[in-house]
């Protein structure tokens, strides 16, 4: 069985770093850098076992086609944007995702990544995420309640089982900027109707009692009676005095599941948009493919 990259399946990480970059050098340089980073990561994982460190290197559509010779990741495409500009695209070539229980270890691994990739990439965005109180979003609502739990369940949702892409996963990242002043002008009841859950105790509001535009309704989708699940690795980010919000990060064996949620959220299916757009907005968006660790090392 192909080995999955170590940052896809962990649960309850306390800190993460996401780095998005474009390729500057040759594809062969990127191949070598990816292997070098994987070796460095293994050293850190052995040195800090209690940190439960994991990381992922993933590639945008054009870069993956160049690396793989056009083989595999058939669903992969550039992030097109949705909602007539409400969800903008900022597609880049490479995504590096580092997560663990320790920010200091994450930072050291990020430094190692910069050393490994060097001049063959140009960093376009680097975001440091943190686990907030009771795994809540900065809005005060618990985040990721429906996230699959347990390694096997998460593997079933996030990891491609067989074929040329076995052990791989599709990745979506999207940075949201919150306007908490706008949120706090709303009553708690209105906030709960917007999200579809109670704020304090995180109880789901019955479907016939919450609006069609509630966040829960927009993303709780089914096809042929089966839920379109994703594995989320999202975390809050930002500063108290400046920009802050949620860095949304999802892994799935099918890009289809992710895209259907986005189409629903941004009104591209029935014209109804996610009500949480009243206080927050996405400012980035990119699709990537994370090959298995075996394939990453064999590029």
Regions found by a protein language model. Give the residues of each.
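Long, histidine/aromatic-enriched segments associated with O2/redox biology
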Residues: 1-299
């Amino acid at each position: 069985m192909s080995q999955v990259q170590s940052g896809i399946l962990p649960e309850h990480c306390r800190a993460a770093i996401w780095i998005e970059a474009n390729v500057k050098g040759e594809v062969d340089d990127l191949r070598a850098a990816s292997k070098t980073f994987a070796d460095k990561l293994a050293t850190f994982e052995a040195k800090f076992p209690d940190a439960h460190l994991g990381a992922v290197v993933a590639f945008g559509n054009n870069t993956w086609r160049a690396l793989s010779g056009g083989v595999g990741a058939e669903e992969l495409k550039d992030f097109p944007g949705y909602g007539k500009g409400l969800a903008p695209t900022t597609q880049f070539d490479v995504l590096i995702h580092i997560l663990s229980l320790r920010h200091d270890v994450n930072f050291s691994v990020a430094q190692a990544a910069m050393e490994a990739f060097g001049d063959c990439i140009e960093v376009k965005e680097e975001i440091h995420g943190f686990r907030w109180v009771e795994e809540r979003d900065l809005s005060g609502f618990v985040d990721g309640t429906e996230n699959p739990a347990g390694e096997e369940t998460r593997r079933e949702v996030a990891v491609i089982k067989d074929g040329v892409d076995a052990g791989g996963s599709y990745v979506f990242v999207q940075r949201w900027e919150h306007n908490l002043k706008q949120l706090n002008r709303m009553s708690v009841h209105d906030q709960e109707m917007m999200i579809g859950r109670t704020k304090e105790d995180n109880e789901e509001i019955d479907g016939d009692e919450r609006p069609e535009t509630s966040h829960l309704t927009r993303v709780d989708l089914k096809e042929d009676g089966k839920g379109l699940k994703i594995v989320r690795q999202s975390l809050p980010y930002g500063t108290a005095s400046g920009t802050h919000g949620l860095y949304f990060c999802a892994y799935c064996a099918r890009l289809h599941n992710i895209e259907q949620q986005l189409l629903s959220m941004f009104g591209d299916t029935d014209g109804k948009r996610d009500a949480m757009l009243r206080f927050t907005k996405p400012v980035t968006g990119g699709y990537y493919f994370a090959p298995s660790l075996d394939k990453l090392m064999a590029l």
